[in-house]
């Protein structure tokens, strides 16, 4: 019996000592969970590949307007130019389809230069209400020099034909396309050049 009691006491002492030693050594007795790495940024458009997505112009002619926009991809750059006419419309845009998962990202980044007029970037997740597609846009400024502009998803404003609507948050895991608009209420020519469009957040510095 005495031998058995000694063994029990030794086991108890060991059980008490082992956790204490682990704490002193800086080792946790609980399982250590390594956090998952954040998703890497994704390039949506680089304008330097043969299989680059096609960009389509949508003018305000669909509303009886007279604005005219033109788009071309050349020398690794998208160029969106034209003339805005505010009467009976007052907008022109270019859009491209790109199915991509941006879950875990904060927003999109564009490297742009232009004529100083403000533009808008649109991110489409295919959300519709009352049979209409919801447009989610945010303004971007341009200067004559190349500048990098970041647009957080939280800055996107949900509208239908320019009128604000209540809508569910952007479904960042199911992005369907990107658009660029000019609708600043001023007649005249415009120019926008885009070097790239990509996401940021996650591992982006």
PLM feature spans:
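Compositionally biased, intrinsically disordered low-complexity segments enriched
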Residues: 1-18
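Bacterial N-terminal signal peptides
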Residues: 18-26
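Beta-rich carbohydrate-recognition modules and glycan-binding surfaces
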Residues: 2, 27-205
């Amino acid at each position: 019996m005495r031998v058995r009691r000694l063994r029990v006491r030794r086991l108890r002492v060991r059980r008490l000592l082992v956790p204490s030693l682990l704490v002193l050594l800086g080792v946790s007795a609980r399982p250590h969970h390594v956090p998952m790495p954040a998703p890497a940024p994704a390039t949506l458009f680089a304008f330097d590949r043969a299989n680059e997505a096609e960009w389509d112009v949508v003018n305000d002619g669909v509303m009886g307007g007279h604005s005219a926009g033109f788009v071309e991809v050349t020398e690794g750059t998208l160029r969106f130019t034209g003339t805005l006419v505010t009467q009976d419309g007052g907008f022109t845009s270019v859009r491209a389809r790109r199915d991509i998962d941006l879950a875990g990202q904060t927003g999109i980044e564009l490297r742009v230069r232009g004529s100083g007029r403000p533009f808008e970037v649109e991110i489409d997740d295919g959300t519709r209400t009352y049979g209409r597609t919801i447009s989610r846009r945010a303004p971007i400024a341009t200067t004559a020099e190349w500048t990098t502009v970041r647009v957080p998803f939280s800055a996107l404003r949900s509208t239908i034909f320019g009128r604000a609507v209540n809508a569910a948050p952007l479904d960042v895991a199911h992005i369907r396309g990107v658009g660029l608009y000019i609708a600043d209420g001023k007649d005249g020519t415009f120019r926008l050049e885009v070097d790239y469009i990509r996401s940021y957040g996650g591992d982006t510095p």
